[in-house]
Amino acid sequence: MQRLLHGMWWVTILIAHQVWAGGGPLQTLVIVNDNETQSLAIGRYYAAQRGIPDAHILHLNIPDTAIIRLNDYGSQILTPTLAFLAEHDLADQISTFVFTFRRPYRVRTAGQENGITSAFYYGFKNYTSSPDCQLVPAGENTYAGSETAFTPDNAEGYRLSAILTLDTLAEAQTIIDRSLAADYTRPAGTAYALYTSDSFRNVRWPQFDESQFLQRLVKSDIQTEFRFSDFLFSESNVLSCVTGLAQPPFISSNDFVPGAIADHVTSFGG
């Protein structure tokens, strides 16, 4: 979320219901780690609830380690995935990948680290500097900021991927069920952006003006509210909340509608 916070967040909320760019059951591959019992259970449940065919579940045997070396990532995750797609004639069909394992979540080589979804999306990137909340040149791609909807055909091989995992299977099932309940509902509510005491995250604050422009452009009935506060407290019908705090207080006091987007805009989550 750090790369395109304002674009990804607001476009998702305001116009996602108007555009369908793949990512349906037949375009999704679920990747499970057979070395994690919970990974397999979550993967099967997600596939069943979303109507994803059993043939679209890829079983891998990945070591239980938080950080995987780049060579091992290539041989144990990326190469087997591409081989699976080629073997089953799915390379031109699959546009979305869902990892249901907890570990690994980072890829490392020569002191450089990428998140596993980042490395999977557009390949491992070497970052030669540490920009404060800025996108380094190595992280740029032609899809970022584009007005063209994402498809595997026009995205130069980029692979949309996400990690789906929680502390317990029951929690994961609850999240999956909530996402299903949100499908096509277009609920009413308010999207919040917070200007917090974390000054490093507040550099994005000026970009939120663009979100108001997008809201007016698409004539959305979604309410937006910007606050100078470290937290939301006891709000109802929360559609979205973006905060610069890694551990925002009172978060559980709020009523998030099914399908709501929440992000602490930090690297705290790995």
Give a label for each model feature.
Residues 1-9:
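Bacterial N-terminal signal peptides that target proteins for export
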Residues 22-270:
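Cysteine-dependent hydrolase recognition
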Residues 16-18:
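N-terminal signal peptide c-region/cleavage motif recognized by signal peptidases
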Residues 9-10, 20:
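Tryptophan (W) side chains
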